[in-house]
């Protein structure tokens, strides 16, 4: 396993603390007026989803987790679990809706995702950062609604709701940032 020092930490990095795998969701390098610099991070547990705040000083180390990522296809949700299939071996894995978490609102049947395994147990899902999804419901446009900074809510085919510019219409396919939950642009289709 690789070992990470204070200088190696960054947003998105997966680390292990006390045997629990985490993902760094926020990173801040602090240089106080007195004393040595340090790094303050917010980490989210892959096991229970809790977010913790940790401080790392020069010389502090943490390990890389024993995580395996496998690309799998989302099949369906049976009400309690989401079902995924390895497209190479056709092996199916059930992951609880709770462990899938926020990723669920971006997945359509057939979506390829990265399933995370910790010590052989499926613990989470990561969807692609940018996805193309169809708008199924939004407010109609009115005369004078042009490209501007005004936004309106739109429901996507997965059920997720994002804010879109007024000039984007129902039925259009848009690109969405799944990490921030934001509209990026219209898809070129």
From Swiss-Prot:
One of its GO terms (biological process) is peptide biosynthetic process. InterPro entries: Elong-fact-P_C, NA-bd_OB-fold, Rib_uL2_dom2, Transl_elong_fac_P/YeiP, Transl_elong_KOW-like, Transl_elong_P/YeiP_cen, Transl_elongation_fac_P, Translation_prot_SH3-like_sf. The keyword Transmembrane does not apply. SUPFAM superfamilies: Nucleic acid-binding proteins, Translation proteins SH3-like domain. One of its GO terms (cellular component) is cytoplasm. GO terms for molecular function: translation elongation factor activity. It comes from the Bacteria. Keywords: Cytoplasm, Elongation factor, Protein biosynthesis. The keyword Cytoplasm applies. It is found in: Cytoplasm. Pathway: Protein biosynthesis; polypeptide chain elongation. Transmembrane segments: none annotated. PANTHER family: ELONGATION FACTOR P, ELONGATION FACTOR P (EF-P) FAMILY PROTEIN. NCBIfam families: efp, PRK00529.1. Belongs to the elongation factor P family. Involved in peptide bond synthesis. Stimulates efficient translation and peptide-bond synthesis on native or reconstituted 70S ribosomes in vitro. Probably functions indirectly by altering the affinity of the ribosome for aminoacyl-tRNA, thus increasing their reactivity as acceptors for peptidyl transferase. This is Elongation factor P. It comes from Campylobacter lari (strain RM2100 / D67 / ATCC BAA-1060).
